[in-house]
């Protein structure tokens, strides 16, 4: 009788734990940053020592005059010049103000900003960047560059450097170095293009410092994504059919015995 109760409680605990792990897999993992050594990537022969020379035009996947996923010059889901359900120009239904003021035109749905922010925090795929994801915002790392001038320059200009990195899933790379190299290249290039479009330019010192900063952030992103990837793999192995069937069989034998 005692064995029966013990077996029942063990089975109940196992089922509850299994369900909780399944739910936890859907929760986003927290981010962070760490500090480390210098850049491991030599220059690529760009003029002036910069690997990423300023380029004209807009950034990859970036709309004209707005942020990521933002319409041209306007807010999310906001009509031009009027509120929802109102025709353009302030006229009444069926009156002037263009074809949008006629009956039969459905209202445009509003975008839920909480969903947009949640997707970005979890590493949303960026359109136009070929499968790259945008990581969560990080605090810029505290780095010493070996001389007072660059240390002071970084402290005074750190706001000019990115606080998010672009990356692909870790399972597409054979090691950390390849992940970090690709992450640094696309992040620095995208940030340089976007900033140059706004009329700002980067000096050789800016490029050197930015590469070091982005490198540390990419290392942090790799560690975060690797931990999440291995946790998903471990959960898949633990709760794969053979171990589950074996455990349930042992519990049944314990209860029957």
UniProtKB/Swiss-Prot annotation:
UniProt biased composition (Gly residues): 33-48, 55-101
Subunit structure: Monomer and homodimer. Has a tendency to aggregate into amyloid fibrils containing a cross-beta spine, formed by a steric zipper of superposed beta-strands. Soluble oligomers may represent an intermediate stage on the path to fibril formation. Copper binding may promote oligomerization. Interacts with GRB2, APP, ERI3/PRNPIP and SYN1. Mislocalized cytosolically exposed PrP interacts with MGRN1; this interaction alters MGRN1 subcellular location and causes lysosomal enlargement. Interacts with KIAA1191.
Role noted for this protein: Its primary physiological function is unclear. Has cytoprotective activity against internal or environmental stresses. May play a role in neuronal development and synaptic plasticity. May be required for neuronal myelin sheath maintenance. May play a role in iron uptake and iron homeostasis. Soluble oligomers are toxic to cultured neuroblastoma cells and induce apoptosis (in vitro). Association with GPC1 (via its heparan sulfate chains) targets PRNP to lipid rafts. Also provides Cu(2+) or Zn(2+) for the ascorbate-mediated GPC1 deaminase degradation of its heparan sulfate side chains.
Disease connection: PrP is found in high quantity in the brain of humans and animals infected with the degenerative neurological diseases kuru, Creutzfeldt-Jakob disease (CJD), Gerstmann-Straussler syndrome (GSS), scrapie, bovine spongiform encephalopathy (BSE), transmissible mink encephalopathy (TME), etc.
Region described as Disordered: spans on this chain: 28-110
Alphabetized GO MF terms: copper ion binding
InterPro entries: Prion, Prion/Doppel_b-ribbon_dom_sf, Prion/Doppel_prot_b-ribbon_dom, Prion_copper_b_octapeptide, Prion_N
Sequence repeat feature ranges: 54-62, 63-70, 71-78, 79-86, 87-95
Gene field: PRNP
Protein name per its UniProtKB record: Major prion protein
């Amino acid at each position: 009788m005692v064995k029966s109760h013990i077996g029942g409680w063990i089975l109940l605990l196992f089922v509850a734990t299994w369900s909780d792990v399944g739910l936890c897999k859907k929760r986003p993992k927290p981010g962070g940053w760490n500090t480390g050594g210098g850049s491991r990537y030599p220059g690529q022969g760009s003029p002036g020592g910069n690997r990423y020379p300023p380029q004209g035009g807009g950034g990859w996947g970036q709309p004209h005059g707005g942020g990521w996923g933002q319409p041209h010059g306007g807010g999310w889901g906001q009509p031009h010049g009027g509120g929802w359900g109102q025709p353009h120009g302030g006229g009444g239904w069926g009156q002037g103000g263009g074809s949008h003021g006629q009956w039969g035109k459905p209202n445009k749905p509003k975008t839920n900003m909480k969903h947009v922010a949640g997707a970005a925090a979890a590493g949303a795929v960026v359109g136009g960047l070929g499968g790259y994801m945008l990581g969560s915002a990080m605090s810029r790392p505290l780095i010493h560059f070996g001389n007072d001038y660059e240390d002071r320059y970084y402290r005074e200009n750190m706001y000019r450097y990115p606080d998010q990195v672009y990356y692909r899933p870790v399972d597409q790379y054979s090691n950390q170095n390849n992940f970090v190299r690709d992450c640094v290249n696309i992040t620095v290039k995208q940030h340089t293009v976007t900033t140059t479009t706004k009329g700002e330019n980067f000096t050789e010192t800016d490029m050197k410092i930015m590469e070091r900063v982005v490198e540390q952030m990419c290392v942090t992103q790799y560690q975060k994504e690797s931990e999440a990837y291995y946790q998903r793999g471990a959960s898949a192995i633990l709760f794969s059919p053979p171990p589950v069937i074996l455990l349930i069989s042992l519990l049944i034998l314990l209860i029957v015995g």
